[in-house]
Amino acid sequence: MAQAAQKPETPTSPATRARVFASRSLASLEEEYGNDRKFIWSVARALQILQAFRLRDGAMGNNELSESTGIAKATVTRLTHTLTELGYLKRDSSRKYYPSPTLLTLGYTVLGKLRVRQLAQAGMQEIATASNASVALAWPEEDTMVYVAANAAPGADGLLLDVGSRVGMANTAVGRAYLACLPQDALEQKFARWEVLYGADWPDLRERILASIDSVRTDGFCIVEGEWRSNVRAVATPIYDADHQTYMALNCGGPSFVLDPVRLREEFGPRLLHLAAKLGWRSPW
């Protein structure tokens, strides 16, 4: 039986966006660091290889890694060999690569230094239990938000993303809560990049982002429904990490049939806002 033709990728297709969100492209790195003699390209490419595994489940071969990162296959082959020898990658029975638990030693060091993460845990769990949903703390990275803490109500972990998971910044409540803290010039830089990335979808998306930003600056939080996933709604508020002098965001999210929009606005949004204040809120506006 002939296989159906695969739908080609477009500049704004999910697959293309995933590559943009997962790691900085070679072109962007070359544009920024092409004249930097101290910049070590082999290190940058090795890190891009490791980041590529966040794009999909399962193991990846050298061809897939080359296509995903834009790095030449010969270079990928040398990098995967080196990373395997160092213990950061393993190979499965099909000889494809997957990340080794050895990588956790690097991540654990990062999490251990995020004091705000430890301070937020008890309050996050209380809100998760009360909402029968999940609560997460996310750190900004490029055009994504990376989960550094996640809690769920007992038996309600179906949508809980693990620590280290990424969600888009433009189409989530947690991302827009963070965007509300950016100075105007930084916000416009992101908008200029997203205009290209999202194409025809951008004008409407931009208006929704601006509405969410206005909500955060007026009410302290924003609610987004059906944009990250069609059946999910969430509320989020910014949080200030004094140790690292940076803004992050807290969200409470779950299935639409579980999280009533009225309770999100009247109960869980204010509770997230209260938790952010306890942790040391600092207004950027």
Q: Where do the model's predicted regions map?
A:
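Short hydrophobic beta-strand micro-motif common in sensory/regulatory domains
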Residues: R233-T237
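Juxtadomain coupling helices with adjacent low-complexity linkers
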Residues: Y33, R206, S230-N231, T246-W285
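Short, solvent-exposed recognition segments
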Residues: A2-S25, L29, A156-W228
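Short loop/turn motifs at secondary-structure junctions and domain boundaries
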Residues: T129-A130, G226-N231
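Amphipathic alpha-helical effector-binding/dimerization core
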Residues: Y98-R193
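Sensor-regulatory modules in signal-transduction proteins
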Residues: I239-A242
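N-terminal helix-turn-helix
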Residues: A2-K113, R117, Q125, A277, ...
